[in-house]
Design a protein with these regions (language model features):
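A glycine- and small/hydrophobic-rich beta-loop-beta segment
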Residues: 298-332
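Glycine-rich phosphate/pyrophosphate-binding loop regions near the starts of catalytic domains
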Residues: 85-150, 158, 167, 243-268
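Glycine-rich, charged/polar anion/phosphate-binding loops
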Residues: 65-75, 95-96, 219-223, 231, ...
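Short, surface-exposed loop/turn segments at secondary-structure boundaries that line and modulate
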Residues: 129, 133-142, 164-185, 282-305
Length: 332
């Protein structure tokens, strides 16, 4: 026989409802984003045999973002028939910011990115991002670090940039050294894909699928904002299955905008919104070695450059970035 809740119990229930309401509202928004009801292309599961989550939403039709090209290939890291290598190529002068795991022993790609984003010149001219799924290259010591360096070197030669201008990310089995030769062998195919298809409509969907591991559906989001009357676009993809926070789980998130924003400002924005999205919930309490969230600004929109953290012109952009990150967080 049910009992009528006490006044204290009613207050607790009301507090929970109030706390959960923003999440419920945001989830509705994420699933009702204009254009999100039509998938860009069929969304296969990350791992054959897994039941697709009942919370799965169609992958949105994401408009091209200026200054970035994306290509995928099957390098053979993932044991199933699926692309497992994703490469982003960015315009010259692209800014980059990153947030990473707080695990005391980060993976080789995490250490690489943290090293080259640090310092006064860090993140000022990032030209590429290379992501592989199936091998985490974590707990691999010097051999793993050397494999990461060789990967960046090969990509830098292809794209005519410095090694430090290539960001890396990996997800998958821990304790196995990355076979960088598999990536090198696919770079010609990747480069052809980058050159052949200028902003294909499904490039973001392919990228989202290419970074999945145990995910049951690809995750993406997009938004638009204004900076002094110029329209700027933001788009992103994420992976993580039962894994949410960059400092407390296993996730990758990559977001690109065509706004022109200094790396220091980009870092401040990413740090601000990570706290209220990716870092606000954990599922299993485990700390991962590979958590990575990277934000890139290509500067191709024509909007004026933002070089100060407190610039009021960032208001619309900051809100749009929060929307994209919240969407990726909620559908993870």
């Amino acid at each position: 026989m049910s009992k009528t809740p006490s006044k204290t119990g009613q207050k607790i229930e009301q507090a929970f409802e109030k706390a959960l309401d923003p999440f419920a509202t945001a989830l509705k928004r994420a699933t009702r984003t204009p254009g999100a009801t039509t998938p860009a292309e069929p969304a296969p599961a990350g791992k054959p045999g897994l039941t697709i989550s009942p919370l799965a939403v169609p992958f949105p039709a994401i408009a091209p973002v200026g200054g970035v090209e994306i290509a995928t290939a099957r390098a053979g890291f993932y044991k199933h028939e699926r692309d497992d290598l994703v490469v982003f190529r960015f315009a010259r002068g692209t800014s980059c910011a990153g947030v990473f795991t707080r695990h005391k022993i980060g993976s080789a790609p995490v250490d690489w990115c943290k090293k080259h984003l640090a310092g006064p010149d860090g993140g000022k001219d990032v030209r590429a991002l290379v992501v592989n799924a199936g091998c985490a290259n974590a707990f691999t010591g010097k051999a793993g670090a050397d494999a990461a360096r060789r990967t960046a070197s090969e990509v830098a030669k292809r794209f005519g940039c410095r090694q430090r201008d290539v960001m890396l990310a990996s997800t998958g089995v821990i304790g196995v050294v990355l076979d960088d030769k598999k990536i090198a062998a696919k770079l010609h195919e990747v480069e052809q894909g980058l050159d052949a298809d200028a902003h294909p409509s499904n490039q973001w969907a392919r990228a989202a699928v290419g970074i999945m591991t145990t995910d049951t559906f690809p995750k993406g989001s997009h938004a638009e904002a204004e900076i002094e009357g110029y329209k700027v676009r933001i788009a992103g993809v994420a992976k993580g299955s039962g894994m949410i926070a960059p400092d407390m789980a296993t996730m990758l998130a990559f977001i690109v905008t065509d706004a022109d924003i200094h790396p220091n400002v980009l870092q401040a924005l990413l740090g601000l919104h990570v706290r209220t999205t990716f870092n606000s919930v954990t599922v299993d309490g485990d700390t991962s070695t590979n958590d990575t969230a990277l934000l890139f600004a290509t500067g191709t929109s024509g909007a004026p450059r933002i070089g100060r953290v407190g610039d009021r012109r960032l208001k619309s952009f900051s809100a749009a970035l929060d929307k994209v990150m919240l969407d990726l967080f909620l559908i993870n």
